[in-house]
Amino acid sequence: DNSYLIKLRENVRWSNGQRFTSEDVRFTIDRLKDSQTIYSANVQNVTGVDIVDDYTLKINLDKEIPFFEYNLTFPILSKDYYEGEDFSNTNKNSAPVGTGKFKITDAQSSYIILEKNSNWWNKEKEITLEKITVNLYSSIGELYNSFKIGNIDLIGTSNDNLQEYIGTIGYSSKEIKGREHTFLALNMSNYFLSKQEIRKAISYSIDRTNITDSVFNSKYYTSSFPLDYGNWLCQEQDSSSGYNLDQAKQVLVDNGWSYKNNYWQKTENYKTQKVALNLLVKASDSAKLSVAQNIKSQLENQGIRINIVQASDTQYSSAISSKNYDIAICSMYVSPSPNLDTFFGADNLSNYSNEEVNDIMNEVKNTTDENILKEKYKRLIEIYKSDVPYISLYNNKYTVAYNSALVGDITPNWYYLFYGIEGWYK
């Protein structure tokens, strides 16, 4: 479907008292298309917005975008507040109006103050927090020092060595699995990798925990699927394709492979083939080089020979684009959208094709039924682990540290660190 009909909540007002309407949404999309911001890509395929009424609009796309509704997660601008302004340079950006629980009442070079928004639409929601101060710092060192002496109540960081900077006392912390996903792409145009038993044996032979422990000192999470970061469609995980050396050997033996002279090999058409593969990694990424060496060691201990190809950034990009690799270590920030075209769509990284997967991918694009989506994604996960076109390795870790005196339900998630902030106090 190339169009979306959007219904807005009625009786919502901006913090300055003006009504929030469809015109504000269209104005925002137009500004995003005219500007270069982190949200511009969200609307790059929008060809136009038709206003149906004050609370209904139709968004038209130049092509079908699976799960386009997940692109509609950008802040909305008030047309009345911003119209006629140079959006990139206006002073109004320092204190924009909003429709949320809190509003900006003061903005300076070193801090921003937010206070309870009396115009917020949900009058039934109790908000105990009266005021939030956002402190701004010119360096991360200043930020950490300010947290240590108690000037800040909460910080969020992907720094793996946070304790070295803020110590271990006076605060609590919670860890969140991030969306930076590292995985192996197995090029199925390769003779060996075209065989499911080889791909399975490789997966069974890699101990992901060994990688996160030895390379990252346990500061990364092992992962088993691209959406395995807390996405609602990937909640149930099993270990069916986890580390299991006995299964690695058995799946090869069952398919006619034999282990001789430290190689897994097989004779077909009077020719003996010994399993040997190239592993592509970006030479400039020292951590990934260590991961590659770890994987090489694990696989060669099981008779699967690995040659590490250390490529320059340019060479790596070229190899990925042309699919000129056997196995590639890849990383990407997985979108909040459950769209898996990168992994299963046309021209995917593994040259993988599966008719059932194609059918599921087409079905999930055209339904909003949560039960159907859960059922279909459960099946996608099963196929991912059975066919092994990719091997998920690990995700980054995000840490939220907060003052021990801070009270309330502090439950940050991968999408929003300040979930439930309206009920915090100290």
Regions found by a protein language model. Give the residues of each.
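Gly/Pro-rich hinge or "lid" segments in bacterial periplasmic/extracellular proteins
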Residues: 72-127, 131, 141, 245-250, ...
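Detector for C-terminal structural segments
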Residues: 111, 205-236, 287-296, 320-426
